[in-house]
From Swiss-Prot:
Function: Functions within a multiprotein E3 ubiquitin ligase complex, catalyzing the covalent attachment of ubiquitin moieties onto substrate proteins. Substrates include SYT11 and VDAC1. Other substrates are BCL2, CCNE1, GPR37, RHOT1/MIRO1, MFN1, MFN2, STUB1, SNCAIP, SEPTIN5, TOMM20, USP30, ZNF746, MIRO1 and AIMP2. Mediates monoubiquitination as well as 'Lys-6', 'Lys-11', 'Lys-48'-linked and 'Lys-63'-linked polyubiquitination of substrates depending on the context.
The protein, known as: E3 ubiquitin-protein ligase parkin
Residues covered by region (SYT11 binding 2): 257-293
Residues recorded with modification Phosphothreonine: T175, T217
Amino acid sequence: MIVFVRFNSSHGFPVEVDSDTSIFQLKEVVAKRQGVPADQLRVIFAGKELRNDWTVQNCDLDQQSIVHIVQRPWRKGQEMNATGGDDPRNAAGGCEREPQSLTRVDLSSSVLPGDSVGLAVILHTDSRKDSPPAGSPAGRSIYNSFYVYCKGPCQRVQPGKLRVQCSTCRQATLTLTQGPSCWDDVLIPNRMSGECQSPHCPGTSAEFFFKCGAHPTSDKETSVALHLIATNSRNITCITCTDVRSPVLVFQCNSRHVICLDCFHLYCVTRLNDRQFVHDPQLGYSLPCVAGCPNSLIKELHHFRILGEEQYNRYQQYGAEECVLQMGGVLCPRPGCGAGLLPEPDQRKVTCEGGNGLGCGFAFCRECKEAYHEGECSAVFEASGTTTQAYRVDERAAEQARWEAASKETIKKTTKPCPRCHVPVEKNGGCMHMKCPQPQCRLEWCWNCGCEWNRVCMGDHWFDV
């Protein structure tokens, strides 16, 4: 396979590697080409510095992935760790964990309700045991953590790749202090920090972006993250068709209702045909949960890209028209025109101005929308079919299609509260000796007794199943 190397943020060049090629071997190839010592090179990928003893497969490097290699003399205490030698983080029983690669970060837990604080980093599902597709590297999971809308060759929703760059020099040479644990960490600028490894760059702020994971991409090709779309790892039924499908869209209502993408497309087109989208002054033209839940309008309007190009163009047109109407304007009634106009409040005669090729020149009556006339309008008909009709959803289907309910059931079956801080902690095999993952707590306690870890627990039921 081919990976592209950008040395000291210059133009990239291809390097041929195998899945079992080590990072140090990659350094040696680059060092020979650039005429520099291999031990002064640092390989940066997806916000993480890659260790010498890791392989291309370990690092989730795919065909035509772009890695950054910078030349920086080692500072005291760094060289041993980078070589894969006596790194205290690798000691058996050590409590410190390697910062998780962005290629394996899962933010789907952050669609849980606000009262489930902490689960994004504490609760991990076991539903990723799908067998890898044919042709994928051994052991590589097909679980997708992110979804994007690819405006490039795909023109559809695709699995996405999370990447990070330095907000100062805009190069992907920043190593994160810690990985993101929720969508806010990724979507809110300057929320996460790190250290830029580019020479002479003092940058410390992280800037995240997404790429389409279905095809090789260049540095400049980015895609918009659709953070309401998630892999259906909890096997929730769709609120409309009641099938279990994946991926799904999880509405931001209190129940976190789930809808499959085909039904979401149908829901949007139906509402669009009836012009029953909601115009929100802050958000724009949007839709609420299909069950009509309060405070559930979709905030990231790129989710409506699921409509496809033709329907999305209609959505944008109707949204612009609705904006004009909300501002007190009118639409030209001549067939084939429909231009938005903003006449004076007491102006009865409205002319669709033909300047700049935008208007048709038609003069019409503001009251009856017919060709302009003197005197009273002959008839004014009330528009028919403008009443909002509820999208029919079966109550039982709505009850079963809740992301929140599956989460709470998982928590109930696989977790116990920490005796000190009461945060839910998952036990997935292993011994009875637990350690609270909350940095402010870190209590060592017994899963069996529910009390602080002691010699009695150690001698009596340390390794009970």
